[in-house]
Regions:
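Flexible, processing/modification-adjacent segments and terminal tails
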Residues: 4-11, 90-168
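Tryptophan-centered motif/residue detector
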Residues: 26-27, 43-45, 130, 190, ...
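N-terminal mature ectodomain segment of secretory-pathway/periplasmic proteins
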Residues: 2-5, 18-98, 146
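Catalytic loop of the DD-peptidase/beta-lactamase superfamily, centered on the K-T-G motif
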Residues: 70-115, 224, 228-248
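Intrinsically disordered terminal and processing segments
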Residues: 23, 73, 135-146, 157, ...
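Short, Gly/Pro- and small/polar-rich lid/capping loops
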Residues: 13-17
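Gly/Pro-enriched, hydrophobic low-complexity segments
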Residues: 154-248
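Short, solvent-exposed secondary-structure boundary motifs
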Residues: 41-52, 63-71, 128-143, 164-170, ...
Length: 248
């Protein structure tokens, strides 16, 4: 039997999913693609400045798969899944690949540089997470809980804590989503486990309608402090501007 709290969390999730376009619209297509314009200090911190300044991405919605192109070389692209990641050329020849990629980050901190295949893993799971939220939260294996509301800059946000299934590659098992009065996700908190558990407060804005689904076109990520506030305005860890968005 579901508790009152579980019913409240489910109602909040349904409200959020509906505000983003609804499951029916989301399930009409199998992929989301966009041009990404990225910046922020993270890329230099991990040893790859400029690597994703202007890049194209496609993520699947019915399985965990993402590809970025061109990736580090105009002829290369990535093929990411939770358990395997590869860099390939235009002929689909494998340039580099790695199974169980998450294990390769053991002992890493925010100051540890990444290999190019590790960069492919991070960018792959990150964009998949962003493109699929909140629609996947009702899938088997996900657990949701409503937290106490949060007030920021005079605005009240409802909060949904999501525990991801073990088989899904993402920032951390437990993440928190801040939902405004219209049902849109405006902030997303997580720890970056592959970078020593670095804390993040990730802000979403400038939503547009893409074939019936609401997608945030601007994302800015800051350090999340112990009091749950962002360290603002610097350092800006990551910024992502999405353009040329399409669903197929």
């Amino acid at each position: 039997m579901k508790t009152v709290k579980q019913h409240a969390a489910n109602d909040l999730l349904e409200f959020t999913i509906k505000a983003h376009g609804g499951r029916e619209n989301f399930n009409k297509f199998e992929t989301v693609s966009a041009r990404l314009i990225c910046d922020g200090v993270l890329w230099s911190m991990v040893g790859h400045p400029g690597s994703v300044d202007d890049i194209y991405v496609t993520s699947h919605t019915n399985k965990q798969f993402t590809s970025h192109r061109p990736f580090l070389n105009k002829d290369w692209h990535t093929a990411f899944t939770a358990q395997h990641v590869a860099i390939k050329n235009s002929k689909e020849d494998v340039i580099e690949e790695l199974s169980n990629p998450r294990d390769s980050f053991a002992g890493y901190t925010t100051e540890t540089p990444w290999s190019q295949i590790q960069l492919a893993y991070f960018t792959g799971y990150a964009m998949w997470t962003y493109f699929n939220a909140p629609f996947n939260f009702g899938d088997a294996g996900y657990k949701i809980e409503e937290l106490e509301p949060w007030i920021e800059n005079g605005e009240v946000f409802q909060r949904l804590q999501v525990t991801f299934p073990e088989e899904i590659a993402t920032h951390s098992p437990v993440q928190t989503f801040y939902i405004d009065k219209d049902g849109l996700i405006k902030r997303h908190d997580y720890n970056v486990d592959i970078a020593g558990g670095a804390t993040a407060a990730h802000y979403l804005s400038d939503y547009i309608d893409v074939q019936g689904v609401k997608i945030a076109t601007k994302r800015n990520v800051y350090i999340r402090q112990e009091d749950n506030t962002p360290l603002f305005p610097e350092p800006l860890l990551v910024s992502i501007d999405l353009r040329e968005i399409s669903r197929k």
